[in-house]
Each structure stands twice: as structure tokens, then as C-alpha cells.
Amino acid sequence: MAEPVNLIFYNKVMDRTAIKQLISRLIAHFGITYTTHILDQLKTLGFQQATFGAISLGIDDLLTAPSKSWLIEDAEQYGNLSEKHHNYGSLHAVEKLRQLIETWYATSEYLKQEMNPNFRITDPLNPVHMMSFSGARGSTSQVHQLVGMRGLMSDPQGQIIDLPIQSNFREGLSLTEYIISCYGARKGVVDTAVRTSDAGYLTRRLVEVVQHIVVRKVDCGTLYGINVNNLSEKKNNFQQKLIGRVIAENIYIDHRCIAPRNQDIGALLANRLITLKTKQIFLRSPLTCKSMNWICQLCYGWSLSHGNLIEMGEAVGIIAGQSIGEPGTQLTLRTFHTGGVFTGDIAEHVRTPFNGIIEFNENFVYPTRTRHGHPAWMCHTNLFLVIKSKNKVHNLTIPPKSLLLVQNNQYVESKQVIAEIRAKTSPFKEKVQKYIYSNLEGEMHWSTKVRHASEYIHSNIHLILKTCHIWILSGNFHKKNNDLSVLFYKNQDKIDFPISLTKEKNEFSFVKNKTQLNLFLFHFYLYKKNKIFIKSQLTNNILNKINNSKNYNFILQEYNIKKKKNFYFLKNKNLTCPLFLKIKKNGVLKNNEIFAILDDPSYKVKNSGILKYGNIKVDLINQNTNFEDPQTKLFRPRYSIIKEGNFFFIPEEVYVLTQSLSSVFIKNNKFIQAGTLITSNIRSNTNGLVKIQKKGNNNYELKILPGTIYYPNETYKISKQISILIPPGKKLFNEFECKNWTYLQWIMPSKEKPFVLIRPAVEYKISKKLNKSTLFDLLKKNKKVEIKTINYLLYEDDEQIQIINEKNIQLIQTCLLVHWKKKYFFKEANVSFLKIKTKNNFKTFLQISLIEYSNLEKKKEKTISKNVLKKNYYDHFFSISKNELKNKKQGVIRIISNQNNGMQSFIILSSSDLVKTFKFKKLTKNISIKTNTNTSTAKFFEFNKNFKILNKKKKLNLTKKNFSIGLLLFKKLGFLGNLHNIVTNSFSSFYLINYTKLISNKYSIITKFQHTCQNPKWYLIDESKKINKLILGKHINYNLFNWCFPLFSLLKKKIDFQTIKLGQLLFENFVISKYKTSYPSGQIISININYFIIRLAKPYLATGGATIHNNYGEFIKEGDTLITLIYERLKSGDIIQGLPKVEQLLEARPINSVSINLENGFEDWNNDMIKFIGNLWGFFLSTKISMEQGQINLVDQIQKVYQSQGVQISNKHIEIIVRQMTSKVITLEDGMTNVFLPGELIEFSRTQKMNRALEEAVPYKPILLGITKASLNTQSFISEASFQETTRVLAKAALKGRIDWLKGLKENVILGGLVPAGTGSQEVIWQITLEKKKEIYLKKKKEFFTKKINNVFLYQDTFSIFPTTEIIHNVLKESISQNNKNNFSI
């Protein structure tokens, strides 16, 4: 053993990776047995040290990194900045979401990276740190959620929620964060269970495909292999690909063979091949193995658990299936739309090496936007950059299609990102639609960058040509569905309050095409420091006044009004009971509408019963006379009595029982006496017959029908009798006579003799005396209006009336209603109370007022009939004022010029309801205002009437009223009424001009002009309704102006002007004055001398290619779809991840996009296909190459999914699965059909042998089968039936007469035979038998001489007596070929 001094001592932390490397080196040098003892000692040592250290995990050990606070604060500031830019209209919704997601993603990742260094510095023995860093329990991501931040979550649809969880589990989550956390719990209990079950089923399918593949041969003799190169692979990945594989072709370096064929590759040879940078290495692979139903030792390579070539008889198929399926539980299950977390097509960032100024040629770049909405330059071709500092010059070359993030001649700092270079191979993307919804109600406007013509006919979809803004101007849309209304005021009229704005016309005409009125009432807000928002108030008033009309008023003089408990009654001496008044709150009556009701007590009943009509006649009238039933609280119609007569009421007792029939003491169709106990708490009040009827679930209706039972003798007449009313004095059954009205009801029990029940009936008569119209004959002089008295019956014939809560029921009501004939043009009547004092007594009367239209003009011709008069005059002269819109605020009418379909829209501009923005607060020396170069030189004709022109020696007399400086100047000016440019400055440059001539120019404030004024005309309206013309001047005599206004000397002599356009759309916080910039976004609708008024608006940025869902000038409601943005999203790594992706590949399901890079693919195809053109075998070879390339691509795609999740799987396992997926071919219809049926699936190796044996080849084409379908198309029908579709597989095998040769593992297990793998393999059995024979033979030879001879000739004797491995394989080969011949003969 070596001395301890010479041993190498590794002083480093042994984490999970280091332990893996140590175990690998131990196995490579000492083997598994020795390594096991070493690992047992390490385990014991670890437990001992953990016990001595008393390591435990407590909640106090969860320490948050101190950098978290400022990291989150920095991210929040960046998020607020993005929100501001979005409000300014600089970013659209997708760019804002990308910025937000990437900011919080970077913050979370940086905090995760800071976690371990923080633990290492502050508390290296922290249990959480040791647990996660060593890999004993928990990953870095899990610990990050405990002590860092939870981060971004996804919603149930897979979209990233833009509200990150800033807290961790140690700090505790808020309610909102907890709900979001529940949404984004990707590895919850449900997901884990589903993922485990999916991975288990995937493993079962994989094992089902390859369960029969066993190593049964050393070398299959193939000359093919797969090519691996060292160009695009990383060193570690390429080394893992090489170790454990066997070389298929000799590898030469400078004509010297460094690795022969059939040599396995170890770690030393792999490192040597990587160091020498060997371009192409051909490796033997299960994909190219020539064996049919098994695999050879050299094509498989090493056993990963032993580090040597695989042993004979090893079931490598099952190992491969379990190796791929078991890590499925570690893969993600769901699909996530990250929305731009990964940059994707950006390969690298270019950073500056030092501080300096950057220079480049601007002709080779053009402006564009980054994916975050930032301005950038796109390179046409290769762009040369020069970075200059004082002592250094650095040159850079930026490739085309790259983004340049800096300006020319800009100062850049060291390590600053100045460019983003795109990757050569662009990742797969998909176009996604993002719907933007309006969060403001108002009117839509856009610029000329939108195609105003709709994309389709009769559509409101408009395409955005270039990046532009869509504006929603705030407002509330008020639409009138009635007829055309008249707007009384014109544009720019001032209105006071309260005043009518509109009136609605009701035209008596037959015109069909009537337009509608749309009132567009804008919501403006008063923006103050305390941010109080006041909405404008507009009210709708119902007016009953009609122009040029006559009123008809009359009073019910004989009736006094009395009030009892909030009810009003009409009392009269001749009435036994008062009239109850029924009037609406607004006091309006329509024609034939009831206004008073009389309930006669003689028509009230106290008992339940049935109503029967006699000889009266009733009529169901309109719904205006519906009344509320006091019993059921439901509205029901009244029945007007049109002919006097009588009706009858038949009393009975009715009880509703909610108990079962067992609790009822009496039986059905039995006669009981008064006072009989019905239930435990109900007794009957009268004698009568009991009738019980079921009404619902456990509900019964019990009736007691009062009367006398009579059994008639003449039974033959019973069937002809019906239930009828018998008048008094008539004999019943020729035996007795009734004195009162009687009701005969026949009862026919099922088991007893029929009988008749003689029931009493109460008669009610209605005569003309009930109609008290004489009492209301009040309008004898005026025949136009009358009050009608109508009797109403409240129940219909044969209706059952039930008493509830012992309340009496009214049967008849007498109602009063107002009636006028249609020839009089009355529409409504107003009812009011009139209080009159007579002899110190106050009496209240009822007054009814009617309004008649009198604006008809009669024509002179007497021959015109009434019908013609109505038709002609009603169409042209009649208008009734129905609705008015009244304004409660003072303001100005402004009519919108955009008219659609004849609809009217107008705005009321009120100074108290708008944003009033003052231009400046105070005067200082540093007033700076921007200039407008387009302002033309103007001339002033006269300053004012009060401005007096004096001689040189005299002073100028100026009135303070007209020329007070500051905010008092031109205080009386009103709103402007134009839509063109207007120029203002901090001081007043507005002047009122009256049309008088200029007397002298010597001492005028304005110098002489050179050009005439080219500005448009402006008008101001003052309070005296005087219109003044406005002209703008720029050249001013400063000396005279300073003399007039001393404060003017504070300013510079050069005054700059700033242009503000009336109607201009301004973004939030636009700069007008340096004293205030916190303005909301909106449209300037009015400009005064000291302030301007802004209509609030919201801009939405939209990029080219997006679509707008409404027309220009239309009204948008809050929440309506406004814009559809089109943006690109990564598809390959984002949309389908983990287990679904693996399952999609293994099941050979088609995908939407191409799975390889087309650009490089076509170049490779062009190079490979040149040698096949004109070759008879060209199609065959190209098909073979494409199939081989498809196999390699499928292996790479599956491997990428596992590598992206951090799972390492050897390629040979995946290659075994793919080999079985591509081992079948499908026969074609061309050629021979007597051997195989067209469309039949057969093995590829079997097809090749058949084509060599037959004269005419069988045409076929390769096919890629999924693992499920491949499992159902094997040589063993027992294996197929045990997997899926047992009945179908067995029936199909029976019809075909299939024979199972039991070559696989599964069919032997099912039948209880020896498994042909491991010790059950034929090769292994023969070798074991051979060893036993050797031992027996050697034991018999014990003589010394014989042993010496045997030692000398041991090789020859052994060779001659016992078979070698080659002999065993030859014998097996002959037996296998014999089995194949038997299969073929069958």
C-alpha cells in the first residue's frame, strides 16, 4: 500500500455532483464490490457526523437575503415606469406584459443566485443551506420559494399572471398572493398524481414494445453506423455520447489509426478523440444492428451499471423502456405560455469594453422597435462601429438583422449593452392574437395610418398599416328610441340653467322612415388637487304643456277628500261607504283609466265557496284595470258587467292539510255533523259531506260541503242529471219544494249507491240602481269629458274562492274613470287636490284638468271631410311635446360634425365639468416658451377703443380695466369657436380688434408690418355676447411695452411662442409650461387667455398588422373589444413541454410545424441528392437516407425534452425504442398481391429476405409507428392480447391461424415458461452446462502424469472435447435459421 504522504488529498465540499464523480471513478478503478464497501463507510461517517452535529431544521433557519428589499423595490420602480409609458401611449399591452414578466423573472433569478452566497458568507452551517446545497433534500428552486420569493405564476389557461408573488413562505402570503399561488401550483398533489400515472402508463407502453429485445449475439456483422460530430456539441455532452459505445469504422488521424473497428470507447479514448477534434466518428448503434428480433453485444455497447460490455442474455429492451419512462415523473405535465420570458431568437448581447463615444454610419440602419417597445436601429448589412475614448479605439462589426440600442455619437459606459445579435437558426414561433378592451366609454378616433376602408364588405374591421395611436374620447352615449327631437340652440350658443335643450316630437303621421335622436353627453371631470371628480348632470323631464292649447278644469264639488292612514277617500252624503282614490304619484290619468273605487259591503263574503254566474254578462277589458288580489298578492283582471242580472255564491268549508291521511279522523264521502273533530286541532263548523283531494306532495285539500243527502228512487235518470241551480218554488224529484235557491250536486262513490247533495246557494243581484251615474253628472255644460261608473266582477264563473287569514272577500267593485271621445285631442288628464276655505272651514276637493290641442288651422273649403282633415292636418301641423332634456349646468352647446345615419349628437361644454389647466402660476425671470417657426408675421389694426393716441410730448393714458397684467387680463373672454391652430404665450398675445381706422403709427405698441396676416380668423365671445376678432402679432415695440407694463422688463426681449391646436390630442404629462406638467391625456376643446380646457381621453398604441373593431367616430362602451394585436410567441420550448411532448414524439403524432431547420436541411439534401440523380437506385437510397435521418432526428427531439428538464438518459435506450418504431414497413398495391395483402404491416428485415428469395420484389414503403400501435403489431399475439383490445386481437389471430413461437419474455411469463433472458437464455444455459462438464471431467483425472500431460496439452484437449463460444453461436444460428424456415413454410 502506498505511503500516506504520497496520497492525493481533496479538500473540497462533496455535493451531489462530486459524489457522482467519485462513485464513477471508484467503479472504474476498483469495481462494484470494492466501491460498495467504500460507500458504506461514507454513509456511516455521514450519519455519525450528523448525529454529533445535532442538525435540525427550524423555522428560524429560513433566512431571507438582505438584497431582496432593494431588488423588489427596483423591480417595482421599473414596473411603474412601464405603466407610465403605457399610459403615455408609448407601449402597447403586449410590450408592457413582456417588460413586466422579464423584469420579475430576472429579479427572481438574481435573488436565487444570491441565496447560496449569502448563506455561505453569513451562516455556512445553516441546515437549509447544507440540505439544499449538498443535494440531500430539496432543490434550489424549492429553497428559493422558502427564503426568496415565490415569483410569477400561471393561470389555469397557462398564461403568466402579471402580478408576481413578492413574498416567500417564511414571510407568509397575503390573500391575493395565496389565490394566485393556488393558481400557479404546478407541482401540487393533483399534478403529481396525474404525472405519476401518465409516466407509469408511458413505461408500460415502452416496455410492451421492446420486451423481447435481448442480447443474444456478440457481433451481428453490420458495416453501418451512425455519424456523430464534435462541431455543435458541448464537451460534456459529446463525451457522454461517446463513452460506452463501440466504433463502427477505423478512426484515422494523419493516416494513423488511433481507434480500430469494434473497439469500445472509454473515458481516456473519448477525451483523446475530443482533444484531437475528430470531425466524424461512426458508432455502432441499435438502429443499424442487423439482428431481427434481438440485438448484438457490440451494437449495444457498455452496460451502464458495470462499465463493461453488456453480458449475454441481458434484457436490454426492458431496461431501455424503464429508463425512459421512469424519469417522466420528473418532467412538467402542463403547458405554459410564458409570453416572452425567454428571448429565443437573440443569440448574444454586444457590450462595450470601456467608456467612450460610439460612432456608426446612419445610412445603413433604419428605426424599429424592440420586443419591449424601446426605440432601436435595425442593421441592413454588416455595420461597423467605432468606440472612441481618450486613449483607446475599438472597432466592432455588427451582423445584419441585429438590433442597435444606442444613438450615433452617444456616450456609452463600460459593459453597457449596445446591440443584440440574432441567432442564425431562428426558433419556431406562432402568431397569437391579444385582445385589447376599452376601459373608457366614449368616442373612437384614429389617424391616417389606419385603413379607413373596412377589410370586408359590411364589416367594421379596419387594418392598421403602421404603428399609431387609437384614441377614446370620454363621453356617455345617450340614445333616444323615439321620434326626431328638435335642438333649440345652435353651435357655440351659451346657455344658462335650467333651460330646455331638446324636445321630442310625436307626429301623427303615416311616415315609415323616421330618424332617431342620439344624444351624446360627454362626461368631463374637474381636475383639482384633491382629485375630486364631478360628473355633468342632465335630467329628463316629462312636460305636459302644449303650445297654443286650452285647458279644461272641473271640480268634484259634492265630494270631500278625507285622509286615513296615508290613504285618500271621497265622501258623499248619498254614499254609504267612501270612495277609495287610486291615483299615480305623478297625478296623470289616461283615457278610460280608473281613479276611484267603491267597495259595497253587501257584496262581501266571509266564507269560502264557488262563484256561479246567473243571467249577467261580463267582458274582460284591458290590462289597465288589473287589481291586486288581497289573498294571493297577485294581479288579476277585472270583468266588466255589460248586462245586469244575478250571480250565485255556494258556500263551503275548505282546509289545506300538510299532514298525512293517517292524521285525519274522518273519511272521504262521509257526512259529518257540526263540531266533528277533523284533525287534532280542526273542528267542522257546519254539517256536510267530506271531500278529500290530493294537491301535491303530502298536501291534501279537505272540503266540507254543507247540505242534505238524498237518495232518489228513479235510478235510471241519474246519468242524465247534472249539477244545476234550482230556483225557489220548484219541486225536487216530485217530492218536496225548496223555498230558496238550491244547488244540486251529484255524488257517485265507487262502492256505494249514487246520491245527490242538496246545497244552499246565495243569490246576488245587480240592477241599474247600483250604477250611480246621476251622482257624478257634473259636466252637463261640457260634453267633451265625462266620468263613467262601471261595475266590475272580480272572479270568473265556476271559480273557487278561498278565505285566507279570515279576511272578507269583495265580489263586486264600482269604479270611476275619466272618459273623453277620440275626436277631442286629449292625451292625458292631471288630477290634483284643491283646498278651499269656506266659513272658517277647510274643504279639499278633487280637481281634474285636461288639455286640448288648439293649433289646428281650419281650411276655408267646407267640402273636406273629417277623415281628410285628420290625414292631412295631422301629418303637417301636429306636434306634441313629450320629453325635454334639461341642463343643470352653465355651459356652451357644441354640435358634433360627424353625423351617422341622420343621428344628432351634441356636447355641453361646462367650465365646472372640464379640466381647467392654467398656463402659468407666477412671473419669474426664467420663463422659457418654445417657438413655432410656422407662425406668420401679423399686423394689428387697432388695439382698443379706449387706447388713446397722443402726441410725442404727451403720455399714454391706459385704463387699468383693459390692461391689468396677469390672470385679470381679458377676464371676460369666452370660448373659442374654431378648429385651427392658435398661438398663445405666457403673457397675453390676444388682442380685441374693433373695425376703426388707425390714427397714427408713431407711438403704437405695434411696429410697422411687412406682410399681411396669413393666420385664420379667430373669434372670442364675451359675456355681453359681443363677437371680437382676434389677430396675432409677433413684432412688438418693447420699449413702449415696458413703459406700459413694468413687469414686462423681467422677460427677455426675444419672446418665443408655443403653438396649441384647438382639437389637438395631447398625451399625459405633456409640457406646456415648466410650472405644471401633471396634465391628463385628452383633447383640447377650448382655449382661453389664461387656461385651456381638456376633454379627457385615453390613447392605445397599436402596431402594424393589428385590427380595429369599430368605425371611426363610433361610440365605444367600457369593456368592448377595441383592438386585436398580433404578436409572435415561441413555440418549440414554450407551448409543449415535458411529458406531453415525449408522448407526442413516441406516439408519432403529427405536429403543426416542421420539426427541423429548413435552411440547413435543404443544403444537406442538395449535397446528398446530387449523387442519386440519374441512378436507378436513387429513390431507394434516398428513402433509406431519409428514414435514417428521421430516426436520428426523433432520438434528438426526445433527448432535448429530457435535457431541458435536467434529466440525463443514454441515447442507446432511446435508439432501441425508435428502432422498434421504424422496424415495420407497409406493403403497396403495386406488384405482387399473392404473398402479402396491400396495406399489411410486416417487418423490414423479413421483407428484405423475401425480396431476395422471390423473383419479383414486394413493393413497400417505410412507416413510423407509435409505441401503442407498434405494441399491437408484433410477432406474438399473446403479447398483443395482454396489452390492449384483447377480444379483437384474439379473434383476428384465430381467423388468420397465427402461431406464437414464444420468443419474447412476456408470452413466456403468461404461459409459465422459462423466460428467454438472463439465466434462461440458450447461450447462458449452454455455457453453464459446459462448465459443469469441465468440472466433472477434471475431477476424474487425478494421476500426476495425467495432470502433467493435461497441462501440456490442455488447449488441444479442451478444444477437442468441449465446444467453444463460436461453436455455440454456430449451433444456435443453425437452430434459429431452421425455425425461420419452419415459419416461412407455415
UniProtKB/Swiss-Prot annotation:
It catalyses: RNA(n) + a ribonucleoside 5'-triphosphate = RNA(n+1) + diphosphate. The keyword Transferase applies. It is an enzyme of class 2 (transferase). Zn(2+) binds at residues 220, 289, 296, 299. It is found in: Plastid, Chloroplast. Pfam families: RNA_pol_Rpb1_4, RNA_pol_Rpb1_5. Its main location: plastid. GO terms for molecular function: DNA binding; DNA-directed RNA polymerase activity; zinc ion binding. PANTHER family: DNA-DIRECTED RNA POLYMERASE SUBUNIT BETA (PTHR34995:SF1). DNA-dependent RNA polymerase catalyzes the transcription of DNA into RNA using the four ribonucleoside triphosphates as substrates. This is DNA-directed RNA polymerase subunit beta''.
